[in-house]
């Protein structure tokens, strides 16, 4: 069966790659609708790659963010969950120095968003990313480090995070 302990253990340790159909079955048993539509995931991956490219070169990301924000619920329950959380954390971590689109936060909160709502969303999102840190690849960890560098107030800690960003992105 799909819940054989040794198979699940191999997946947890990263020594086995689960088939998407098996993942979908596992999540279904937990009552979660896991997103496996390859066309949707491919399109979303391209949009996330565009977001990260724009970020690296200082280009506008509003349009890409709005497309991805519209897919938030589906992406959270997909293999791209870390990436969409990174995209949203990066986007909203910029709110300290530039105007950001609050409509996504408003739709989550079901009311007009203010700075505290953005901060609460960021805190919750970063808290989840902290728990997912061991699952991140080098590039994801670099973007996670970027978020952490933006959110910390301590200059020494900020520099440590920036060095992790630089190290992680120089290899991509």
Regions found by a protein language model. Give the residues of each.
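Short alpha-helical DNA-recognition segment
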Residues: 1-10
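DNA major-groove recognition helix of helix-turn-helix
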Residues: 11-12, 22
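DNA major-groove recognition helix of helix-turn-helix/homeodomain DNA-binding modules
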Residues: 19-36
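Short C-terminal boundary/hinge segments that cap the last helix of small helical domains
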Residues: 31-47
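Alpha-solenoid helical repeat architecture
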Residues: 39-44, 77-83, 115-123, 135-143, ...
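Helix-turn-helix/homeodomain-like alpha-helical modules used for DNA recognition
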Residues: 42-102
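"A position-specific structural signal for the A-helix of alpha-solenoid helical repeats
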Residues: 49-53, 83-91, 119-124, 140-148
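Alpha-helical repeat scaffolds
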Residues: 60-71, 98-113, 125-136, 156-168
């Amino acid at each position: 069966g799909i819940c054989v302990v040794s198979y699940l253990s191999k997946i947890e340790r990263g020594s086995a790659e689960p088939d998407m159909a098996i993942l979908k079955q596992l999540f279904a048993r937990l009552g979660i609708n896991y997103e496996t539509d390859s066309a949707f995931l491919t399109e979303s991956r391209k949009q996330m790659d565009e977001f990260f490219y724009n970020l690296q070169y200082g280009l506008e990301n509003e349009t890409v963010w709005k497309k991805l924000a519209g897919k938030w619920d589906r992406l959270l329950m997909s293999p791209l969950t870390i990436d969409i959380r990174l995209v949203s954390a990066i986007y909203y971590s910029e709110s300290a120095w530039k105007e950001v689109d609050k409509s996504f936060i408003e739709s989550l909160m079901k009311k007009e968003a203010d700075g505290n709502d953005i901060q609460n969303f960021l805190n919750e999102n970063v808290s989840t990313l902290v728990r997912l840190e061991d699952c991140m690849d080098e590039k994801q960890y670099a973007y996670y480090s970027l978020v952490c560098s933006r959110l910390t107030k301590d200059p020494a800690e900020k520099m440590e995070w920036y060095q992790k960003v630089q190290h992680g992105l120089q290899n991509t």
